[in-house]
Amino acid sequence: MPRQDDSGRDMTSDHPVGPRAYEKFSYDGFDGEVGRIMSTSTPAWTRPPTAPDGAPNVLVVLVDDLGFSDVGCFGSEIDTPHVDRLAAEGLRYVNFHVNPMCSPTRASLLTGLNHHLAGVGTVCHMEPGFPGYAASIRSDAVTMGEVLRDAGWSSLMVGKWHLCPDSQLTEAGPKDGWPLQTGFDRFYGILDGFTNFHQPHRLYEDNHALDVDDFPDDYYFTDDLTDRALSMVGEICDGHPTKPWFL
């Protein structure tokens, strides 16, 4: 009597490899089937995350030591037309809490957590060895970069990171607290807390330090960051015009 599998397929020995050719195997995380031979296997390709149609680009600007009324839309005597336009076309918040230190503010902004819960209770330099003061974002704290990257956005960052201890500022690592290990596809800027705006002491690109110590007379760090940000966004638009970005 012919032997059949669950789908009714004949598993008698008329197959050149024999009845075991029709056996199927499944693996966790794999939606296809693996048979004894290629003709009895079903492939499955992992699809990259794709943002919804019409998903917006997300631009976040964090400025150190910025007072409440230091921009025009909040009453500054200094003209800030581009920031004012962003405010006019978006939302302005007047009730908020912020830590008056750079590293804790960055950790809270990226994770949505109180800075102690995020692991950054004070400015990141040394790890004092107490809970809430790890000098880097906790590994189980999900960042905005991770959420948007995993939802289909390109995740980019330029500027000052300041979310890893001094012991992680070398090429030797560990690099657990670096931007590319914390949800970002690209990074350009500095990892520590400050630098010279005309001659930065150590610049980083993606996951490595740059060997640059000679800058032109008209070099200005902020202009460099702006140019790099535009370049990153341009590369995304050229390579994948419909993919949104988070910067």
What name fits each language-model region?
Residues 1-247:
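Formylglycine-dependent sulfatase
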